[in-house]
Amino acid sequence: MCTRQLTITNPHYKKLAEDFRVSIKCFSGREDFKLHVPCGHCDECLRKRQQQWFLRANHVMKRLKLRPEQCLFCTFSIKPEVYEQTKEKPYLAIRRFMDRLRKHPRFREKGPSGRYRYRKVRFPYIFVVEFADGKRARERGLESTHRMHFHAILFNCPLYWWQVRDLWESCVGRAWVDPLNSEAGVRYVLKYMTKDCKAHQYISDIDARKNGKLFVSHGFGRLSKEDIKIMRENMLRSSTSWFCVYINNFRYSIPRYWRTACFTKDEIKCRNDSLIPAVLWSIVQQKYRGLSPFQQQRIYYCLLWQ
């Protein structure tokens, strides 16, 4: 749970006030006029975001039936000539690299008219921005410049690892590319998303906003109609399956995107109202087993009506 929740005005009432040209204070008496939302930057929020993107990546690998060695684990650095330009707009370097990859001679073929063309190449990918923390520089007795670089996973990339390495090194900088050993490599790359916190803000404010920034391919982890049907059935099996999913015997909370894709708002509210009280009471009994039943009830009601 977020440790620094923000209180905001419900955007729904802002829109209603604009549409009917009335003061937003007219809706201040509504129960959901003020909403408590996660801050998105505390350790808990970043950890939750990392886990949710790992679930998407795991879903991509299952849907495409990929083995880890069919994915590429990459670290991309940037040469001085293009460093400032890349640091200002990291997504441009990624986009240009992907454009060059799609125009690789391997994808050049003759069309029906006899003219050469490039066949369409699409595959999922993840890029995470990181600014060096200076740890290795200190070990070598050097001063760190906290340079920006990318960590990436290319899922089912149609090129060999050395071709990807040569493409990046031909115009952007150094590259270290290897086949992925296991899904732990995906978690390793996504852990750099947690760099967006005070403990790692040793750089300027502008650069700090980019530290841990995530870039993914269009539609990454999107659910198909068949996926929605299967997930809907699985989530309705029990109270546990509604809140979490197991991957390699590890429990992960269900991403909000999956729940909203499979159910309507009314269905989600109805399901939560029926399950949360019982689940919360069992958690209170387990965590505060040394307290009296009366004290447990007080804690339970405080948490339930927060």
Show which residues each predicted segment covers.
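Right-hand nucleic-acid polymerase module
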Residues: 1-146, 157-306
